[in-house]
Amino acid sequence: MDHFDQDTYHNLPVEIWKHIIDSDIDSTINLLFSCKQFIGLVCILTNNLNLLNLLVKKGNLKFLEFYFRLNTETNKLYTEQRLRVEQNECLKMSCIHGCLEILKYLISIGVDFRMNDDEPLMLAIENGHLKIVQFLYSKRVNIRARNNRPLVLSCEKGYINIVNFLLDKKASFVSKQNEVFSTACGFGQMDIVKLLVEKGADINVGKIPPIRAAAAGGHLNVIEHLVNKGASINKCSVDSLFSAAFYGHLNIVKYLLGYISEVNIIYYAFEKACINGHIDIVQYLFSENIITKDIITENSNTRYLFYHTIRNKHKHIIKFLIENNIFDKDKKYPDILESAPKDMDPYDYLISFLNYQ
């Protein structure tokens, strides 16, 4: 390179240049490959994986080849084991970033594209790279690896193009646990839900039934679609209500209350909302008189509700309940609030007082 780059290199000690490049490889990568002096720093960088990741991400195959050749030929500390580790990582990075040319190159020099039970395939699916998935399939990877994980993962991420490809290649969504379909429902991937329903997916059964999965994920549109398609909501309405309350999905709680009237069941949903800090559900159930002061105080499990809500430090829930004169009758909450130091929020004091008893 020109004298400017060489002079620039000699203006600072090698240790300083190493620190500069290590601290921000994204901004300094072009400097690293500007002249032979800077290129020599490649062998002493602290985290070479950052550099390799950037080269793969940019699709810089020539620089990648040069990196391996430079280290192999000039770096006495560069062992065969380190070479294999870095090449394996580069192959995984090529699947993450969708760099087909680099993937092909690494496979051509013998890097194992089926490492760790087809991890490269999983990484390509997780990041939505259909071309990588198609190429790996042509290399005879197992598209049913890890108990059908490729299809489950593509449903989770919502990549319908990959789902279609896997189905075309005879991956099956049918299983006793119905994991593929329930996953699509749980992550709200409506296009995939519709596709699988059209192909005959069971809309009722599963280790986690589809409606319950959708309730836990907060996807009312999926629940409504399944019900419209004939799903039996009554069979899983209770567990679905509990899941919606646990995860804080008020719109689904409202919807499911249209199918549930038992006070004890609704109380336990209220309890889950309290313990997990979902004030909007708590206030809604209370304001609509679905849950009342009498229902709470007369329930034999009130102590459990307060204990865990306080342990989880949900001050806004505790404050709401006490301001409505609702509390575990065995605890003198008003007295504790009154005894709070003047420089401390009374409810913070209550929580700290009860948590350290």
Swiss-Prot record:
Repeat recorded as keyword: yes
InterPro entries: Ankyrin_rpt, Ankyrin_rpt-contain_sf
Residue ranges of ANK repeats: 34-63, 86-115, 116-145, 147-175, 176-205, 206-235, 237-265, 267-294, 301-331
Pfam families in alphabetical order: Ank_2
Alphabetized PANTHER family for the sequence: REPEAT PROTEIN, PUTATIVE-RELATED, SURFACE ANTIGEN BSPA-LIKE-RELATED
Disulfide bridges in this chain: none
PROSITE patterns the UniProt entry points to: ANK_REP_REGION (PS50297), ANK_REPEAT (PS50088)
Species: Acanthamoeba polyphaga mimivirus
Name assigned to this protein: Putative ankyrin repeat protein L42
UniProt lineage: Viruses, Varidnaviria, Bamfordvirae, Nucleocytoviricota, Megaviricetes
Keyword Protein transport attributed: no
Top-rank taxon: Viruses
Keywords: ANK repeat, Repeat
